[in-house]
From Swiss-Prot:
F(1)F(0) ATP synthase produces ATP from ADP in the presence of a proton or sodium gradient. F-type ATPases consist of two structural domains, F(1) containing the extramembraneous catalytic core and F(0) containing the membrane proton channel, linked together by a central stalk and a peripheral stalk. During catalysis, ATP synthesis in the catalytic domain of F(1) is coupled via a rotary mechanism of the central stalk subunits to proton translocation. The gene is atpF. F-type ATPases have 2 components, F(1) - the catalytic core - and F(0) - the membrane proton channel. F(1) has five subunits: alpha(3), beta(3), gamma(1), delta(1), epsilon(1). F(0) has three main subunits: a(1), b(2) and c(10-14). The alpha and beta chains form an alternating ring which encloses part of the gamma chain. F(1) is attached to F(0) by a central stalk formed by the gamma and epsilon chains, while a peripheral stalk is formed by the delta and b chains. Belongs to the ATPase B chain family. This is ATP synthase subunit b. It comes from Rickettsia prowazekii (strain Madrid E). It is found in: Cell inner membrane.
């Protein structure tokens, strides 16, 4: 190997050239790679944070759903109890109302029965008085003849009873 040879110097020049170009390019490439690595790390951290936030939000939502289910169950249970109580109260009110109406109807029927009975008795008495009056008027009997007839009948009854004792 000869130091004066052109290919030798060309090779050394090329190596120096590559070294000189590579050195500043190396810094630029390393800086670009470091920037990309930092960006990727930030994105990974953001993704991890988003994942943690999503998991936390999922758990919170899950707890809220459980609370809502519990609340819904309680509301349904309370509404069932309230409905049953309302039904019982209204049934009791209806029964009391019907009992009052029944008692009122019975009382009304009894009042009407009493009124009708009294009316019939009054009508019957009026009719008897009218018939007796007509009878006495048609027979044209005076008070004396009525009294005489009654006396005669009572004497007849006394005579019959004496006659029965004698026999």
């Amino acid at each position: 190997m000869n130091f004066l040879d052109e290919s030798f110097w060309l090779t050394i020049s090329f190596v120096i050239f590559v070294y000189l170009i590579y050195r500043p390019a190396k810094k630029a490439i390393l800086n670009a790679l470091d920037t990309k690595i930092s960006e990727i790390q930030e994105k990974v951290l953001k993704a991890k944070k988003l994942k943690e936030d999503a998991a936390l939000l999922f758990e919170q939502t899950k707890l809220q759903i459980q609370k809502l289910e519990t609340l819904r169950s309680q509301m349904i249970e309370e509404s069932d109890k309230a409905t049953k109580q309302i039904i019982q109260d209204k049934t009791k009110e209806m029964e009391e109302f019907l009992e009052r109406k029944k008692a009122d109807a019975i009382q009304l029927i009894q009042n009407q029965k009493s009124t009708a009975s009294k009316d019939l008795q009054d009508e019957f008495c009026d009719e008897v008085i009218t018939l007796v009056s007509k009878y006495f008027r048609s027979a044209k009997l005076s008070e004396k003849s009525i009294a005489k007839n009654l006396m005669d009948k009572s004497d007849f009854v006394h005579n019959d009873s004496k006659a029965t004792y004698l026999h």
